[in-house]
Amino acid sequence: MRESVAASTSVAKPRLGPTHALLAAYLLGVAGTLWDWREHFLGVSSQAPHLVIDLGGLLAIGVLAFTGWAKISRAEITGFYALLALVALITLSPFVLMMSAPHSRLMAVFMQFGMTRSALGLYLPIVLLAGWAAWHWLGLAPVGAWRLAAALGVVVVAIASIWDLYWHQTHPLEMGASMNMMALPPHQLILAGFLLGAIGALAGVLRSGRQSHSRASPSV
């Protein structure tokens, strides 16, 4: 009888783990992408949805990279922190600049640089960091369908971000608040990446819950 009570208590209080955090990060990215689509559909140009998208991607990378941190060498840790700082600067500085000095000379220079091919190179560290984080996380346990989806979701988002910048460079006349973001292939791929990761993470959460329930169930 006591064993049954203890088992039911353990099932009633599930523990939150990295997979739950990964699911939350991907859902944040999905919410930011849909918010951005809605803003443009209504004819509103706002940077807040972009910040939510960036935070969702950075959080997903962070969860993948920091899980199993003890197994990473000191050199890898140093390289990761340096790359993470660079990626955070690349992704968040445009938002800060847009909010603090939207009409400044620095903002004008930044916008001009953003329309050059050299700007595409700035996004390569994002793909590199996302790929390394996914590879590290996949190496912590046997690779299954849900783990592969959860890890590759943010890699798809990173690659789609480069494609998005390239698309805007090659379609300069199709920019503005009224542009239908839902019709843009890069934006569709960004949403697909977040959804892929969210589905994989959700499958992992459900699988972990079933395993916990099986272990907690009384054998008699």
Feature locations, PLM:
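Membrane-interface interhelical loops and short amphipathic "cap" helices
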Residues: 35-51, 99-117, 165-188
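Membrane-interfacial loop-to-transmembrane alpha-helix junctions, especially the N-terminal start
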Residues: 14-26, 72-86, 142-155, 217-219
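Short, intrinsically disordered terminal tails adjacent to the first/last structured region
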Residues: 1-13, 211-220
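Small-residue hotspots
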Residues: 24-26, 32, 56, 86-87, ...
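An N-terminal structural lobe/cap that precedes and organizes the functional/catalytic core
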Residues: 19, 147-148, 158, 162, ...
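Hydrophobic alpha-helical transmembrane segments and adjacent interfacial helices
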Residues: 26-42, 63-64, 85-103, 132, ...
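Cytoplasmic membrane-interface regions of multi-pass membrane proteins
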Residues: 66-77, 132-145, 206-214
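Hydrophobic cores of alpha-helical transmembrane segments in multi-pass inner/ER membrane proteins
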Residues: 53-69, 119-136, 188-205
